[in-house]
Design a protein with these regions (language model features):
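Short beta-strand-to-loop elements that line the ligand-binding cleft
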Residues: 46-53, 137-152, 189
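Extended ligand-binding regions for polar small-molecule ligands
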Residues: 33-42, 110, 115-116, 196-231
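Bilobed "Venus flytrap"/periplasmic-binding protein-like clamshell domains
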Residues: 26-38, 100-135, 149-151, 166
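Periplasmic-binding protein-like
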Residues: 15-17, 91-95, 179-215, 238-243
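Ligand-binding clefts/hinges and TM-proximal coupling segments of bilobed small-molecule sensing domains
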Residues: 46, 124-138, 180-181, 215-244
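Acidic, polar ligand-binding/catalytic clefts
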Residues: 37, 50-111, 125, 186-192
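Short helices/loops that flank or line small-molecule/ion binding pockets
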Residues: 55-67, 84, 111, 147-169, ...
Length: 244
């Protein structure tokens, strides 16, 4: 009998449930999970994605020797010190969400100083927003998930929340929300820029080698086509790719 082919070694990553980008309930572990999986397959490995609360995911992904890193993260100067970032594996477009019957008007982030804003602990929303929040210029209240913030917004416990645009649409498309609730939510899209996201490989010699191998493999994979096909198959209203 011919010998059975050996199973490829798994490359493990830590993340949190963040549909439609990462979820154990979605095909390929979500859109970004699918993109990463395609590159890792090209490298000759299988992909294993484990789910934790976000702060725990960062701790495990960056420091547990059984993991290659954390997926997926926006680059900023602070994070550059803790990991080796891959080339882009997608993008995120943060928006300010509020209720139509209580609109929030702001020409720039600094104009939100009187608005109580829901965020998620451990997330980066861009250097400007993060700096304003750290300085106390913005009144932010961290929660443990975007889902909780959406519920708080609808319950009027927040005047506004910051959230990824396509994730908001995905969450509101769930059956637990009525069409009337979906229609109550409006977004301001101009306050944040679209940002690329990356695999955050551990800041070790092995992590650097993995990051370089990942980037080489990514150049041989048509990630844009995979993303287009994924959104088409998902058929989530308004969830077309956002160009970086």
């Amino acid at each position: 009998m011919p010998a059975l082919a050996a199973e490829p070694q798994a490359m493990r990553f830590a993340t949190e449930e963040w549909p439609p980008f990462f979820s154990r309930a979605l095909p390929g572990n979500g859109l970004t999970g699918t993109l990463i999986g395609a590159v890792v397959t090209r490298m000759g490995y299988a992909t294993q994605i484990d789910y934790f609360p976000w702060r725990r995911a960062m701790e495990i992904g960056l420091h547990d020797g059984g993991y290659a890193g954390v997926v997926a993260m926006v680059r900023n100067p602070e994070r550059e010190k803790t990991c080796y970032f891959s080339s882009a594996v997608g993008s995120r477009h943060t928006v300010l969400a509020y209720l139509k019957d209580k609109p929030v008007t702001a020409g720039a982030l600094k104009d939100l100083e009187t608005v109580r804003i829901g965020t998620v602990g451990g997330y980066s929303y861009g250097e400007q927003f993060d700096a304003l929040a750290r300085s106390g210029a913005l009144a932010v209240e961290p929660a443990i998930s975007d889902e909780i913030n959406v519920r708080k917004l609808l319950a009027r416990r927040f005047v506004a929340i910051v959230i990824e645009k396509r994730m908001l649409r995905y969450l509101l498309a769930a059956e637990r929300y009525t069409q009337a609730e979906r229609d109550r939510v409006e977004t301001a899209d101009h306050l944040f820029t679209t940002r690329s996201v990356h695999v955050c490989f551990q800041h070790t010699a092995q992590g650097l080698m993995q990051q370089r191998a990942f980037d080489q493999a990514a150049r041989e994979v048509d990630l844009s086509r995979i993303e287009r096909d994924y959104w088409r198959d998902m058929q989530v209203p308004g969830a077309a790719p956002v160009k970086p």
